Regions:
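Positively charged n-region of N-terminal signal peptides that target proteins for export
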Residues: 1-5
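Tandem repeat scaffolds
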Residues: 17-105
Length: 105
């Protein structure tokens, strides 16, 4: 009789912060994604599908959301200062307590 012992090494990476600043998410499908509390300053969401996504409490200053599909997306308590929202779809989007200072559509 042979006894085989398997040893598995599980590595869990814990990120010190949720920083995704200045990344390019252009033309991606991120339906239902959870970015809550993330640092997304300067990120590009050009023509990105973010329907039903959770972006609550996010730092999105200087981000580009040109043509983004934000239908039913949660952007509550987020900072959207100086964000480009041209052609973005905002039907049903939760913008409560959101800073939209100097943003334009």
């Amino acid at each position: 009789m042979r006894i085989i012992i398997f040893t598995f090494l599980i590595i869990v990476l814990t990120l010190p912060s949720r920083s995704f600043a200045a990344l390019d998410y252009g033309k991606q499908s991120l339906v239902g994604a959870d970015f809550s509390g993330a640092d997304l300053r300067g990120a590009t969401f050009y023509l990105t599908d973010l329907q039903d996504a959770n972006l609550s409490g996010c730092e999105l200053q200087n981000a580009t959301l040109y043509g983004a599909k934000l239908k039913d997306t949660n952007l509550s308590n987020s900072n959207l200062k100086e964000v480009t929202l041209d052609s973005a779809v905002l039907d049903g989007t939760d913008l409560s307590n959101t800073n939209l200072e100097d943003s334009f559509a």
